[in-house]
A protein has these predicted regions:
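Non-globular targeting/processing and membrane-anchoring segments
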Residues: 10-186
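Short pre-active-site segment immediately N-terminal to redox-active cysteine/selenocysteine motifs
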Residues: 3-4
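Cell wall/extracellular polymer interaction/catalysis modules
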Residues: 7
């Protein structure tokens, strides 16, 4: 992903939620998408640059390739993908694996078991909202934000469960994840 990208900003919430069911993040920082890339409205979010993730079930490397501020019309470099990860991106971030001919971000590769790109959350739900307000909304299962973020997190979790052979059982066997698993591949 990239910090400027509004769709990356949207997808980080469900991705962090999904991965947190399997392990622990440290060093997540607050950031926002470039307002100029979203009709002047930022999407406040979490960034993977400088963070680490540990899990006994799955490995995760989150890359933010560029920041959210242009200098002389160019975003600043952040993370460089290792050669093996760059090769996967070059191979699979194009048709027939993803819809846009030029590829898309965010892009998630599930260890040879699946690929997802784009955001599963409607940006109108999060535009201009503070991270603390978004977190409060996610915690309220009756809110539209929670339904969207948790619903997308359940899809991501179901895809991760394919990689982990449905471990841990309490995560992969939950009703929300099982319902999401039925939607994979559709």
């Amino acid at each position: 992903g990239a910090e400027y990208c509004p769709y990356c900003a949207l997808e980080r919430y469900p991705l962090v939620l999904a991965l947190s069911r399997f392990g622990t993040f440290t060093g997540l920082q607050s950031t926002n998408s470039d307002p100029a890339d979203n009709a002047g409205v930022p999407i406040y979010t979490l960034g993977f640059h400088g963070s680490t993730y540990t899990s006994k079930y799955v490995s995760f490397s989150g890359y933010e390739t560029v920041d959210n501020t242009k200098v002389n019309g160019v975003y600043g470099k952040l993370d460089t993908l290792p050669d093996a990860d760059q090769a996967l991106l070059d191979k699979y971030n194009k048709p027939p694996y993803v819809d846009p001919p030029g590829g898309a971000i965010p892009w998630i590769y599930f260890g040879g078991k699946g690929i997802m790109n784009g955001a599963g959350v409607d940006k109108a739900l999060l535009e201009g909202k503070a991270i603390s307000d978004i977190a409060t909304s996610i915690a309220d299962p009756t809110s539209e934000v929670s339904k969207a973020v948790v619903g997308d997190a359940n899809l991501l979790t179901a895809q991760i469960c394919v990689m982990t052979n449905n471990q841990p059982a309490e995560v992969c066997g939950s009703s929300g994840v099982k319902a999401a698993a039925a939607k994979l591949g559709q």
